[in-house]
């Protein structure tokens, strides 16, 4: 007797859940439902969908797929990762308070401080590496603790089980931006999180060819409220983008494991070169190395450290020389693709964050974030070695 679908392994689910052969024509690849509206059999009598802003068959298949990868009951897909984060924060009212990891993605800072703050939400940006520190900042009007783990770009980790216990005791929701780890490397709902956010533009897609975002949860109430907001605000992905993502998750395990293996080899090599800083959770000297070993696990239980490395080359001159000499790595924003990318967070991904704040956190002008791809690791090492040579 074959296993039931909920007992399938990660890759089997990523390939088959939401991807069963089309019932009408038998096509193995899911069709794309490129339609804005649907025929109704009578007034208010539809066949499951009425308008693609509300729902679309291709999006429904993708949501089924992404939910199973996160071990979630529900998944809600958005046009971008920022659309997903904005929807999450829009669950709350003027006067409510949200705590956020201190070196979160710059787009989250821009949206929170320049948009939602004007609408009455209040924010504090705190060190979430220590659960006791999180507890100190929770107020009576705190509604949400939103953490990145690892953070972007300094790769600080939050102990999710301990932080979830703090939030539960205070009656506060815990949301986790899991973009850097993907469901293959970390499943925050299993560790006590209430909502998981991911930019599906990144490792879920893995080919730098689509924008998307997703929220997953086991809460029926949160799912209902988030779907109402999505219907009201309209930040939905197109059917084609949904289909591209549904295709891409089939290879998530292969891509993420290979890129992470490459990152481990490169980080250990870089750590011996005498750079100002090499930041990677897999290094013994990383402050939260033990947390990484505890919670960053593949579905079979193996420890995994992710595919992101940050290095500080010490000066703007060294940075510019490094970037100019690269030939395999591409200078570009984003991450998680099959191709290796690099960026300077100070001027790129975190440009919206005030200079004083960046420097206080350790985001210097000479800090370079590396997104490790699936190329031959020898070629990546040679490219970095050449770029670092004087």
Task: Give the residues covered by each predicted segment.
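N-terminal "arm"/small-domain region of PLP-dependent enzymes with the aminotransferase-like
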Residues: 1-56, 62-65, 368
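Conserved PLP-enzyme active-site core in the AAT-like
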Residues: 2-6, 16, 75-279
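PLP-dependent enzyme catalytic core of the Aspartate aminotransferase-like
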Residues: 122-124, 317, 324-325, 340-390
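Short, solvent-exposed beta-strand edge segments and adjacent coil->beta transition regions
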Residues: 210-212, 304-308, 365-369
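Conserved small-domain helix->loop->beta segment predominantly found in fold-type I
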Residues: 264-336, 353-359
């Amino acid at each position: 007797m074959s296993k039931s679908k909920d007992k399938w392994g990660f890759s089997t689910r990523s390939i088959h859940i939401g991807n069963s052969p089309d019932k009408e024509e038998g096509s193995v690849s899911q069709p794309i439902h490129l339609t804005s509206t649907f025929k109704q059999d009578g007034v208010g009598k539809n066949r499951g969908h009425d308008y693609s802003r509300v729902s679309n068959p291709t999006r429904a298949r993708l949501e089924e797929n992404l939910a199973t990868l996160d071990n979630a009951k529900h998944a809600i897909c958005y046009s971008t990762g920022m659309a997903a984060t904005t929807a999450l924060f829009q669950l709350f009212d003027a006067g409510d308070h949200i705590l956020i990891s201190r070196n979160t993605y710059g787009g989250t800072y821009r949206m929170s401080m320049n948009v939602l703050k004007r609408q009455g939400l209040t924010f504090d940006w705190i060190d979430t590496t220590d659960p006791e520190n999180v507890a100190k900042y929770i107020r009576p009007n705190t509604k949400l603790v939103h953490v990145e783990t690892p953070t972007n770009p300094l790769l600080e980790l939050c102990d999710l089980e301990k932080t979830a216990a703090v939030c539960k005791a205070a009656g506060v929701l815990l949301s986790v931006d899991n973009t850097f780890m993907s469901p293959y490397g970390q499943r925050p709902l299993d560790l006590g999180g209430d909502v998981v956010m991911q930019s599906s533009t990144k490792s879920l897609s893995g080919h730098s060819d689509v924008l998307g975002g997703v929220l997953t949860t086991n809460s029926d109430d949160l799912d209902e409220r988030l779907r109402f907001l999505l219907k009201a605000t309209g930040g939905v992905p197109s059917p084609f983008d949904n289909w591209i993502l549904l295709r891409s998750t089939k290879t998530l395990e292969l891509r993420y494991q290979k890129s992470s293996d490459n990152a481990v080899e490169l980080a250990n090599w870089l750590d011996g070169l005498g750079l100002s800083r090499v930041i990677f959770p897999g290094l013994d000297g990383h402050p939260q190395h033990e947390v990484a070993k505890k919670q960053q696990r593949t579905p079979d239980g193996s420890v995994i450290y992710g595919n992101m490395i940050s290095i500080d080359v010490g000066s703007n001159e060294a940075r510019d020389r490094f970037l100019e000499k690269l030939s395999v790595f591409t200078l570009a924003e984003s991450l998680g693709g099959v191709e290796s990318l690099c960026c300077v967070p100070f001027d790129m991904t975190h440009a919206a964050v005030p200079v004083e704040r960046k420097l206080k956190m350790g985001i210097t002008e000479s800090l370079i974030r590396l997104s490790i791809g699936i190329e031959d690791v020898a070629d990546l090492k040679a490219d970095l070695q050449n770029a670092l040579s004087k």
